Amino acid sequence: MKDGFIKVAAATPKIKVADPAYNTEEILKIIDETEKKGASVLVFSELTISGYTCGDLFLQQPLLTECKNQLLRIVKATKKKDMLVVVGCPIIVNQKLYNCAVVINRGEILGIVPKTHLPNYSEFYELRHFTSGEGLDEMVMIGDEYITVCANQVFTCENIPELVIACEICEDLWVPLPPSTYHAMAGATVICNPSASVETTTKESYRRSLVSNQSARLLAAYIYADAGEGESTQDVVYSGHHLICENGSVLAEAKRFTNEIVYADIDVQKLAAERRKMTSFPGGKVGDYIEQTFSLKIKENKITRTFPKAPFVPDNQDERDKRCDEILSLQSMGLKKRLEHTNCKHAVVGISGGLDSTLAVLVTARAFDLL
């Protein structure tokens, strides 16, 4: 971390449906690549290990057993990786199947987050195979360890306290009150969303707005990893539209249909500062949340994020004209109110010939036009 910045990434491999061994090979390649580029947090798409479009194969025990075996392989491979990895995997708990995000750090599963809202409309039929994770709080044996399976979990970095991670999965974001809202109220500053969002005309812009708006509402960073190439195209197409947003700004976005890995430097210290400043933002824990802890090395990565030299001056001429008119209107309305309040009929402006006095004349002229 340098000056509060954490490098994060979103990715999806080119998968083969219902081939966990092949998919895991591709997952491990991406883990190696992103680690070399300095990523501290990596999020994969929904049900990455199996593929999202397995259909009724999700009801077959051999597939589920192999997914579990390959998950353990990923866990083992991350033992010497200084990063947190979120990967999608079907998990059986008490004879019920859950669509889960598995959170891994340094060869250990920190926790398993089940999907809460299962779409069962239009082209979706998840309830045919999966159970909602709402209210679930159980332990499941993965390898030699019992792991918590619960949607209400946050993952706190011990040596970077501003880095608090939580997960929701695809449809969870599209409902009226997403789980990420509660996650943020419980302290999460980074939301990870392993997703499999089908591609339709005009959905790209809607999805982008949804992710960026949620990051703004939560004063959080949002890492959205979308399913892509290799998923079945029997009914729909997946584009791999990854997004990384921070407090309403889109920091990185994948070009659709390319299987591109996207990276961004998120500023967790700034997010924490913004929450402190906004006194209406809920503080403390909300509800019954389980806190898991992990650690990361403090990396002094080169920051690739760029910032505009003039942040309040848009590059686009039309937007610039609107911004200037907005500023002029704000000042004019403020002066108009003072003139009305004091019953003033005249104004005297000292002219120096500089920009400030020129602006003062323009503001005064518009204020009198508004009276």
Predicted regions and their residues:
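Enzyme catalytic cores with a strong preference for nitrogen-chemistry domains
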Residues: 1-350, 358-371
